[in-house]
From Swiss-Prot:
PANTHER family xrefs: ACETYL-COENZYME A SYNTHETASE
Superkingdom per UniProt: Bacteria
Gene Ontology BP term (one): acetyl-CoA biosynthetic process from acetate
Residues annotated for CoA binding in this entry: 190-193, 309, 521, 582
GO terms of molecular function: acetate-CoA ligase activity; AMP binding; ATP binding; metal ion binding
Organism: Pseudoalteromonas atlantica (strain T6c / ATCC BAA-1087)
Binding-site list for Mg(2+): 535, 537, 540
Posttranslational mods: Acetylated. Deacetylation by the SIR2-homolog deacetylase activates the enzyme.
Enzyme Commission number(s) from the entry: 6.2.1.1
GO cellular component, one term: cytosol
Record-stated family: Belongs to the ATP-dependent AMP-binding enzyme family.
Protein name: Acetyl-coenzyme A synthetase
Length: 646
């Protein structure tokens, strides 16, 4: 790991929100007197009823309960839109850049208000009300944000489904949360390719029983022909004549705001529930301090609203702070790898927040991504989704940031709501690849496999010892799964599932997942979900999926397969199985390497030893550790001999 230290640049200290002394004082108060600290921070939101009960939380596995501001009342959409109108209604909320470089739009806060009110009234016309679930399967267009905020305005609970997911994944999520309405578009656009969103929805509803689904709202984005059913309604028809006046529903701070599905290590995705008050405060306060955001900044989070980064740092955090954000439909490499730089120059972007995968994709082209690009407007860079390797950090810092922009390398999860470990641009000297220090209220610790806390410079399992306002409250419809997943491994603490090390300067470095969840290009994928898709193919008897180091994606997907008897292994079959996963689950889940084998390493009780498979996939087969419980050690020798990642 790099131990090179980059001091805080002088310009980052000027007019900043925090000095190192401010951070030390505020952090101490946030962990020593959380009720006092968070009551003060909550004043940054507009409340219908100011909360007096600030923190009521328990990590006891017999009674896991997380409540913040529980007697407070507010509306998220009001906080993100209405309260800005009097003084900032004319200010741009979103600069939208289409996949096609010639497509763009400007959405002011006034226009955002009117568009959200119309679709909110449209939803009310369809009978959607407080507590109803609405699925959103949209491209990266402003209407995706309008739909999310419309749900928040009327008290409906949204679940955004990433536009790259398959019909099966759509149906699973719709059925799990019993969504009443689904909002989609005719098609999406990505790198010039048309993504058949409406067709995917049609397939999901035709091939699966989705009894809760009553209506599908379709936004006309590309204008391509789509099939039509009796339960379909065009967005423009629904909103035509709808009023731009839509009184916001008064919500309790602990009412659910959204459900977002994240991969679990035991098969079915988990519907992580975030609530209204604590989440909004957490998203907004982290956006303000992590990015040192100030009015007038042009801020760009290059994520997708289908993931939590898009929820917190495209929609809720920036809008609560009255920010101006860039929203980008396309990919960093289309039409060519200078697209990011061109958008930065075109809109004079000051803050750029993207994923190591995107950084590595651009880095592969050397200096070309910045050829003809000024980049002089940039003052801050950010990284999210997975640990950034020092080589990519250096390229980002020198080539994109011109060796003058601090990098905030943030660690957090769907379940944490927003940033947890992060440098602060005016406070933290940077170490390439380090997530650095905890944000206000976050109390990290490292423990060994038995749960004993480790002190000093060490490596272990990362836990959080107390609650924070943006913490997920439960898994939708399955609180026991929430408890078992996060609170039983190391009782009395939140188990992140990540490993980390702490250096002699108390900087935290994330070392990767310790469970069976992969982090592919910043997207979390459950190995069990991929294995389930693989074994549903008629040629596959058994499957085991592990991650391995991948230059571009961070983690690649390495698949071990046992064929059914009589199946002939061919290149065509391998390609077919790969495409099968792509269709059943998502293009993101497409295997990088598929190794066929007559056997898998199993214990005598029949459990696959994935630890060994991970070592082989990573070419670390000389460090297999204890293999005494293997039923047939010769299987391992064969797998090593035939390994694909040489």
């Amino acid at each position: 790991m790099s131990q090179q230290i980059y001091p805080v640049p002088a310009h980052a200290k000027e007019h900043s929100h925090l000095t190192p002394a401010d951070y030390a004082r505020m952090y101490a108060e946030s962990v020593e007197q959380p009720e006092v600290f968070w009551a003060e921070q909550a004043k940054s939101l507009d409340w219908v009823k100011t909360p007096t009960k600030i923190k009521n939380t328990s990590f006891d596995a017999h009674h896991v309960s997380i409540k913040w501001f529980e007697d407070g009342e507010l509306n998220v959409a009001y906080n993100c839109i209405d309260r800005h109108l009097a003084k900032r209604g004319h200010v741009t909320a979103f600069i939208w850049e289409g996949d096609d470089p010639h497509s763009h739009d400007i959405i002011t806060y006034h226009r955002l208000h009117d568009e959200v009110a119309k679709i909110a009234n449209g939803l009310r016309k369809l009978g959607v009300g407080k507590g109803d679930r609405v699925a959103i399967y949209m491209p990266m267009i402003p209407q995706a944000v309008y739909a999310m905020l419309a749900c928040a305005r009327i008290g409906a609970v949204h679940t955004v489904i990433f536009g790259g997911f398959s019909p099966n994944a759509i149906a699973d999520r719709v059925n799990n949360c019993q969504a009443k309405v689904l909002i989609t578009a005719d098609e999406g656009l990505r790198a010039g390719k048309h993504i058949p969103l409406k067709d995917n929805v049609d397939t999901a509803l035709a091939e699966h029983d989705c009894p809760s689904m009553e209506q599908v709202i379709v936004f006309k984005h590309t204008g391509s022909h789509v099939s039509w059913g009796k339960d379909d309604v065009w967005w423009h028809d629904l909103t035509d004549g709808c009023s731009t006046d839509c009184p916001p529903e008064v919500m309790n701070a602990e009412d659910p705001l959204f459900i977002l599905y994240t991969s679990g290590s035991t098969g079915q995705p988990k519907g992580v529930v975030h609530t209204t008050g604590g989440y909004l405060l957490w998203a907004s306060i982290t956006h303000k301090y992590v990015f040192d955001y100030k009015p007038g900044d042009i801020y760009w989070c290059a994520a997708d609203v289908g993931w939590v980064t898009g929820h917190s740092y495209i929609v809720y955090g920036p809008l609560a702070n009255g920010a101006t954000s860039v929203m980008f439909e396309g990919v960093p490499t289309y039409p060519d790898v200078r697209r990011i730089g061109q958008i930065v120059d075109k809109h004079k972007v000051n803050i750029l927040y993207t994923a190591p995968t995107a950084i590595r994709a651009l880095m592969a082209h050397g200096d070309f991504p910045t050829e003809g690009i000024s980049g002089e407007s940039l003052r801050l860079l950010g990284s999210v989704g997975e640990p950034i390797n020092p080589e990519a950090w250096h390229w980002y810092y020198t080539t994109v940031g011109q060796s003058r922009c601090p990098i905030v390398d943030t660690w957090w999860q769907t379940e944490t709501g927003a940033a947890m470990l992060t440098p602060l641009p005016s406070v933290t000297a940077m170490k390439p690849g380090a997530a650095s220090h905890p944000f206000f209220g976050v109390q990290p610790a490292l423990v060994d496999g038995q749960g004993n806390e480790l002190s000093g410079a060490t490596e272990g399992n990362l836990i959080i010892t107390d609650s924070w306002p943006g913490q997920a409250r439960t898994v939708y419809g399955d609180h026991e799964r929430f408890v078992q997943t996060y609170f039983t491994t190391y009782p009395g603490t939140y188990c992140t599932g990540d490993g980390a090390r702490r250096d002699e300067d108390d900087y935290f470095w994330i070392t990767g997942r310790v469970d069976d969840v992969l982090n592919v290009s910043g997207h979390r994928l459950g190995t069990a979900e991929i294995e389930s898709a693989l074994v549903s193919h008629n040629a596959v008897a058994e499957a085991a999926v592990v991650g391995y180091p991948h230059d571009l994606k961070g983690q690649g997907i390495y698949v071990y397969l046992m064929p059914n008897e009589g199946v002939e292994i061919t290149d065509e079959l391998t390609k077919e199985v790969s495409n099968w996963v792509r269709k059943e689950l998502s293009p993101i889940a497409t295997p990088d390497l598929i190794q066929w084998s007559s056997g898998l390493p199993k214990t005598r009780s029949g459990k696959i030893m994935r630890r060994i498979l991970r070592k082989i996939a990573a070419n670390e087969y000389e460090q297999l550790g204890d293999t005494s419980t293997l039923a047939d050690p010769s299987v391992v020798d064969t797998l090593i001999e035939q390994r694909l990642n040489r």
